[in-house]
């Protein structure tokens, strides 16, 4: 966009930098509260390969031989970093004639765009987790037929029938973790500690977490998904503005593998356009957001 002597862009650099990074620092960030954030290793991509655990120890008789086991070579996946950028232009007359400092709104608006983009891209991993985003096994992140490498167990971290957030459907999410096994079929002792919901579900989620008694009944039944009753472990609520479905919700354990990798954080640069004398400013960043292994997360698309 153009907002319109001699080269003058360098004289604006300090002002633009200050306006941009002051606003960028204030931009609320959600993804870091949900994703595991890492600095990217060298190179233009990240490769991860899976190796199954070993099986359980076998009983041997006195003088008997120990049986040797081998892990299963697993899935291998490569993730490439994506580049995002945007810029604006200021003309010399605009800068000189703007007595009220309106031009300062432009770096602030650019900072807001830069601050939101990582959140949008990161939470799209959840938004598309039922339909296009895949984990290392090639299945959708949330699916009904993941298969373990060594034991051949079928794992469903999505219900066969989608359902609205309720005591019954949330209980099914906790039960998923109770019955979870690793790639060798051994029990996995992981429990969810975070319920991720869109803004439309925050009231229903709070009721489920805080009500001691079962919701919507006059009986004295316990609300089994309230940590107060000691049936499920404590968990926290995260309400996201970036979940695009008004019904989908997710349970996450600390061991989940939703990963955000920074390759290059926001960098602001400037130059002058020789043909127009406009001062050009741009910001760019490079990162990747993905899920490597599905087991630490349960998702329900809702209804």
What are these regions (language model features)?
Residues 2-8, 142-182, 186-194, 199-303:
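Sequence/fold signature of self-assembling virion shell proteins
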Residues 20, 24, 28, 32, ...:
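Residue-level signal for secondary-structure boundary elements
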Residues 25-84:
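Assembly/oligomerization interface modules of large self-assembling protein complexes
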Residues 19, 72-73, 180, 266:
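Short alpha-helical segments and helix-capping/turn motifs at coil-helix boundaries
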Residues 76-133, 195, 281-283:
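Long, contiguous amphipathic alpha-helices that act as assembly "spine/axial" helices in icosahedral shell
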Residues 1-27:
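N-terminal alpha-helical "arm" segments
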Residues 118-154:
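Glycine-rich, mobile lid/loop segments that gate access to catalytic sites or pores
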Residues 59, 78-80, 93-94, 140, ...:
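Residue-level preference for alpha-helix termini and adjacent loops
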């Amino acid at each position: 966009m153009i907002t319109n002597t001699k080269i003058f862009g360098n004289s604006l650099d300090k002002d633009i930098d200050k306006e941009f990074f002051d606003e960028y620092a204030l931009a609320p960030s959600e993804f870091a509260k949900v994703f595991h954030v890492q600095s990217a290793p060298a190179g233009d991509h990240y490769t991860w390969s899976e190796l199954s655990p070993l099986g359980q120890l076998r009983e041997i008789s006195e003088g008997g031989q120990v049986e040797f086991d081998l892990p299963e070579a697993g899935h291998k996946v490569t993730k490439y970093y994506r580049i995002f950028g945007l810029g604006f232009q200021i003309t010399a007359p605009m800068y000189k004639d703007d007595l009220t400092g309106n031009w300062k709104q432009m770096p602030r608006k650019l900072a807001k765009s830069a601050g939101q983009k990582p959140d949008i891209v990161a939470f799209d991993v959840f938004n598309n987790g039922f339909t296009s985003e895949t984990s290392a096994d090639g299945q959708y992140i949330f699916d009904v037929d993941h298969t373990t490498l060594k034991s051949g167990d079928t794992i469903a971290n999505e219900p066969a029938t989608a359902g609205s957030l309720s005591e019954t459907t949330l209980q099914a999410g906790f039960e998923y973790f109770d019955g979870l096994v690793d790639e060798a079929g051994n029990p996995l002792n992981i429990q969810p500690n975070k319920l991720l919901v869109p803004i439309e579900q925050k009231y229903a989620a709070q009721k489920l977490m805080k009500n001691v008694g079962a919701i919507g009944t006059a009986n004295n039944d316990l609300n089994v998904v309230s940590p107060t009753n000691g049936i499920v472990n404590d968990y926290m609520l995260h309400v996201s503005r970036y979940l695009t479905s008004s019904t989908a919700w997710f349970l996450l354990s600390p061991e989940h593998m939703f990963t955000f990798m920074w390759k290059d954080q926001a960098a602001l640069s400037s130059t002058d356009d020789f043909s127009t004398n406009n001062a050009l400013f741009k910001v760019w960043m490079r990162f990747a957001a993905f899920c490597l292994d599905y087991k630490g997360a349960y998702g329900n698309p809702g209804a």
